């Protein structure tokens, strides 16, 4: 009986095939990993985590996690959608300093091509700010993020959020309210993908 169970497990393993997991075209279609499946349709909807460092071959950017979701399988390639990003907890802890203020915001925005994204920007001041200054900075962060999203398509906005251009735009304006040490987009989450979103390109 034991031999039959082992044989069935071996036969099931042999029936599975390897699939490469590919990032979207605007992330250079980088191969971010591989997985096995007996039925490729079971891969669709699975989330995969990688880092900006792995996507760009720049290991200094491994503190930024990128979340992808498999949307289709073509041949031995599993294509993906970008579902968001998040800075590692260790990285955030490393930039928190005593006697300073941390200002967080949480805002849902809509891009001009209809994607709804939850964005979580964070500011760190040089010294401790007053509550009125913190509120003014928070309101400015929300205003800038909403404006940039409304003016951008999904790909452009997410690249700006992940690669630092959006945080730089916040820094340039908010520093006049109170001196800032750093601004980060701590996290993004894709809440809604429009029905008219283009289908993934074939490999």
Swiss-Prot record:
Any Gene Ontology CC annotation: cytosol
Pfam families hit by this protein: Ribosomal_S3Ae (PF01015)
UniProt-recorded name of the protein: Small ribosomal subunit protein eS1
Protein origin, superkingdom: Archaea
GO terms, biological process: translation
Gene: rps3ae
NCBIfam families named in the record: PRK04057.1
GO molecular function: structural constituent of ribosome
InterPro entries: Ribosomal_eS1, Ribosomal_eS1_arc, Ribosomal_eS1_CS
SMART domains reported for this sequence: Ribosomal_S3Ae
HAMAP family: Ribosomal_eS1 (MF_00359)
